[in-house]
């Protein structure tokens, strides 16, 4: 099995080259779609722009929501990935609900 070439995507999921990806990647403010602090937890949703789906038949997963426990040096306690900005925004809101209800531990 060979290595798959890295695939880059813009905010709308359209393929782009690495130069365009670097342009979109910095500064972080333009790729961060959600950031909330809830008690000792931080919920963050960002555009990655790289396909993190390791299933060759699946959709590119280019957005990510993570929950961090800031009382433990920002240790991540949950991670979900999405194909679209809409899924990521909805997932961010769902993660906020999970943290508020302390359901994040069941990811």
Enumerate the language-model features and the residues they cover.
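Short intrinsically disordered terminal tails
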Residues: 1, 100-107
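Short N-terminal "domain-start" leader segments
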Residues: 1-62
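Short, ordered coil/turn segments that flank beta-strands lining enzyme active or ligand-binding pockets
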Residues: 11, 70, 86
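Short, exposed beta-strand "edge-strand" segments with a Pro/Gly-rich flavor and a Y/T-containing core
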Residues: 11-16, 77-83
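Acidic, low-complexity intrinsically disordered regions
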Residues: 17, 43, 94, 100-103
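Short aromatic-glycine-(Arg/Gly/Cys) micro-motifs in beta-strand/loop hairpins
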Residues: 48-78, 94, 101
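A short, charged, amphipathic alpha-helix used as a generic interaction element across diverse proteins
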Residues: 83-101
């Amino acid at each position: 099995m060979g290595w798959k070439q890295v695939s880059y995507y813009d905010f709308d999921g359209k393929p782009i080259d690495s130069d365009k990806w670097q342009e979109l990647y910095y500064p972080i403010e333009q790729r961060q779609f959600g950031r909330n602090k809830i008690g000792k937890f931080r919920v963050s949703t960002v555009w990655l722009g790289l396909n993190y789906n390791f299933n060759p038949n699946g959709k590119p997963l280019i957005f990510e929501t993570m929950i961090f426990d800031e009382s433990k040096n920002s240790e991540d306690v949950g991670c979900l990935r999405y194909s679209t900005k809409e899924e990521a925004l909805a997932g961010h809101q769902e993660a906020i609900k999970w943290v508020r209800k302390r359901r994040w531990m069941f990811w």
